[in-house]
């Protein structure tokens, strides 16, 4: 099953759950329709989540935690969840949808994503949208590299990006 990106609609019934991963603490955010956010602790661009209720038994949070554990254990390469990115402009949503198309174990450059979106001069804007991806790992922004193949920034930290790419067999 491919990742489904649904339209964002902020609802009063949004829930959050902190989880532990091999790369540190994350917070997951979901509503009744799917996963909306996944941020590492101290990651750049985390919105305020203080207004959200804790949802330890909420279906999409539990399913997201389960699939993420399978990913880290090497038993999952693709997530099967409805993804509803928290916030973002129409352009950012297009970029985030493009991230969902980058296969496990592969890379794409900012310039390749810009060309894919029909905006070959927009690599810098692509980079800014990638940096604000609200669904770390689930929308694989860690698979985006510079045009020369160099590892560039990751809102969760470059060390985490390296670890994720190693987990996927992209780096030795």
Report residues per predicted region:
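Regulatory, non-catalytic segments
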Residues: 124-133
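A generic hydrophobic-helix recognition signal that picks specific residues
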Residues: 17, 133-135
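Short Lys/Arg-enriched helix C-cap and helix-to-coil transition segments
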Residues: 137-144
């Amino acid at each position: 099953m491919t990742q489904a990106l649904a339209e964002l609609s902020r609802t009063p019934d949004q829930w959050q759950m902190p989880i532990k991963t091999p790369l540190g603490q994350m917070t997951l955010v979901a509503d009744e329709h799917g996963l909306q956010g996944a941020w590492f602790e101290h990651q750049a661009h985390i919105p305020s989540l203080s207004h959200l209720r804790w949802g330890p038994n909420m279906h999409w949070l539990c399913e997201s935690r389960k699939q993420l554990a399978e990913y880290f254990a090497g038993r999952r390469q693709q997530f099967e969840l409805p993804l509803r990115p928290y916030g973002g402009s129409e352009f950012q949503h297009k970029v985030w949808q493009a991230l969902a198309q980058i296969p496990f174990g592969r890379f794409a450059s900012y310039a390749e994503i810009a060309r894919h979106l029909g905006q070959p001069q927009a690599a810098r804007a692509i980079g800014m949208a990638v940096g604000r991806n609200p669904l770390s790992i689930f929308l694989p922004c860690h698979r985006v590299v510079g045009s020369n193949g160099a590892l560039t920034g990751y809102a969760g930290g470059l060390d985490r990006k390296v670890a994720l790419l190693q987990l996927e067999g992209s780096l030795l």
